């Protein structure tokens, strides 16, 4: 009995009357997504909650692990090897040029496979992922502590999404973070004009 868009996400203006009646009994919390403040939340009582990219980066140990990986890459001359590949065009429509690229890419993969299969590299990537999930779970618990039980909440999430990564800025979670929140809370999208 729900109207759903192509991404299987429900917009507030598409709710049916009986769904709207259910929503009226819930506490409404608005969410404004962004690049620096990944999530900025506000309810009717002006209670605020913020989840920033800096907080996520700090809690996930991402920057620290990336520095260690970069240092190891420099020590093992991985960056030099990977830079050689940049002289080839991977998007070429010329058969011979693309064939040369594939040959070089295969040689490079054979040379650097040992580094990427190294236990240190895999542990650092795993640690970043685990601590990232831990940070998200901590934030979800903060939502419940700040606004109440998940059964009593309706989160109105702005549908902003960044289609292109900004230059020199570390990538951040956008739609993925919304999906994490949707697994635990009732979420409807609000069209941001």
Where are these regions (language model features)?
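Positively charged, helix-rich recognition surfaces that bind polyanionic ligands
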Residues: 1-193
């Amino acid at each position: 009995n729900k109207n759903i868009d192509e991404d299987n996400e429900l917009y507030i203006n598409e709710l049916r009357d009986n769904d709207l009646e259910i929503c009226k009994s819930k506490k409404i919390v608005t969410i404004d997504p962004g690049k620096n403040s990944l999530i900025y939340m506000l309810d009717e009582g002006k209670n605020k909650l913020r989840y920033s990219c800096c907080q996520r980066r700090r809690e996930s140990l991402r920057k620290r692990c990336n520095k260690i990986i970069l240092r190891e890459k420099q020590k093992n001359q991985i960056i030099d090897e990977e830079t050689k590949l940049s002289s080839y065009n991977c998007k070429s429509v010329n058969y011979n040029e693309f064939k040369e690229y594939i040959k070089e890419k295969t040689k490079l993969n054979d040379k650097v496979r040992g580094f990427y299969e190294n236990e240190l590299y895999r542990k650092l990537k795993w640690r970043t992922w685990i601590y990232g999930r831990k940070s998200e779970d901590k934030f979800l618990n903060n939502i419940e502590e700040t606004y109440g039980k998940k059964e009593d909440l309706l989160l109105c999430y702005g549908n902003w999404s960044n289609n292109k990564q900004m230059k020199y800025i570390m990538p951040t979670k956008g739609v993925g973070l919304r999906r994490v929140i949707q697994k635990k809370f009732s979420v409807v999208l609000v069209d941001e004009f």
